[in-house]
């Protein structure tokens, strides 16, 4: 195997597949990338047995065909370190991969291609096309609310719902919930899958860099997202996602509208003196005024008043300050709306005049 390729043609794809490769070296070949050079171009593949990401690079100059596997991290780091206009030569010499450019040469150890696992792709009955940017935004607006290592394994991921007219993405860790939606025509009939946490994070990262149309297909076991450049395959989490609609609070609404940046900066200052373990913050609501208060066991405290548009009842409510901060960080509008249902019930956080994004945050006793 021997070929040459410019850094700009391979660097981005290499970084993306390297982030999928298994970092714990329990099975050494999973830390490697499969490189396959042939007439159609260069194929890069990485897997951790849950995710498989494949990239096809056509802009190479092929000298001889072949394939091998080499350390994902080391190869990505090396390519990242060379100047942008560098032309790299890859040559497989027995059990080592030689990479050279100008006066530089590196020799990498390889592992047998036969040891590299390739995903068994199931049958996919239907697929839907949508801009990668839209799916990336849905994941970005919800994934912060995913659980991590929860015994309720179905919470360690995001719910993807596809109906004939829209796609919904939902995430919850039991203390907060994020729901985002986009309108699109599909051939699906109210189908649901749960995408694992790492898969959701890697997919968002991928689609942020490839915002054009992608195709999505899935069955009960696998998700496939693909374009002309890449194919992303992920196993799914088995089981049923909880009926999240029951989490949305009911009752008399009391709406507060505010400048998002004003609330964020006040929260950031309050966070400095909040309890490091429980992360509590108190909202004191009065006519057109929101007082944000925090304290800690060292008898330190902070409070700040933020002008808001509010005509509801005066009351106090506590939250985990990190939950509010993370919610606001993915809201795109300059104006934000909090919808309260009393001091004992969850609160909604929304973009003003936008029903495609809803965050639910449970209250906290302070």
What are these regions (language model features)?
Residues 1-366:
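Structural preference for solvent-exposed beta-strand-turn elements
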